[in-house]
C-alpha cells in the first residue's frame, strides 16, 4: 500500500485595512494573554490575535461582539493585558473620557496599542471629529495618566503608538498630572518620548519603533501566515 503524502499545512491569510504595523509589532515584541479590541468591526484583528492564542474580548456599537454599545458607557467586568484601539479615537466626541476609560481598563503594566489616521485638519471626513499627530496623541495620553516617555511611535499612512501603562507623575511632587491643560509643557516634557516645547513641532514620524521587518512568534495553528494590507508593504 502506498502511503499518502503528508498534508500540506494551510496558509492562513489576514488582510488589514488599518493597524498593520502596530499589530505586527505587538505580536512580535510583547508578552500578553488577554486583549480588549475596541471597535472590532468585522473582527480581522481579533482573528489574528486568536491565531496566536490570545483571549480576545470585542467591543462594537452593534453586531456580534462581547460588549455591544458605546465603549464610554459600557460596564467592564475585568481588566486586560492589552487594549487594541485601531481607528477609533478619531470618532470620539469626548476624547478625555475615552482615554481615561482605556487607562482604567488596562491592568498595571498593560499595553495600549492605538492607531489613528493621518490627514490634514483642512480635510473634513465623515465621522472623523479630530485629527492626530504624535505630539497631540502623547499630550492627551499623558493627561489621561499615561507616562509616554518610553512609547513607541511610527507615522506612515497612519499613526501607530504602543505604550505601557505606567502612571504619569510630576516627579518633583510625585503626584498625578492635574486634569485639563493646566500644567506647562516644559514640566510635562519628561513624560514625552521626544523633546517638546511650547510652541513646538508636534509632527514626529518615528520614535523607538525599530525595524519594520517583523518576526512573528509560533502560532497556535500550523501553516504559513500571510499578512497583507492595502496601505503597507511588509517584508
Question: Would you name each region that the model predicts?
Answer:
Residues 109-117:
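Conserved beta-strand signature within the Rossmann-like core of class I S-adenosyl-L-methionine
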Residues 1-84, 98-99, 103, 130, ...:
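Conserved N-terminal segment of class I S-adenosyl-L-methionine
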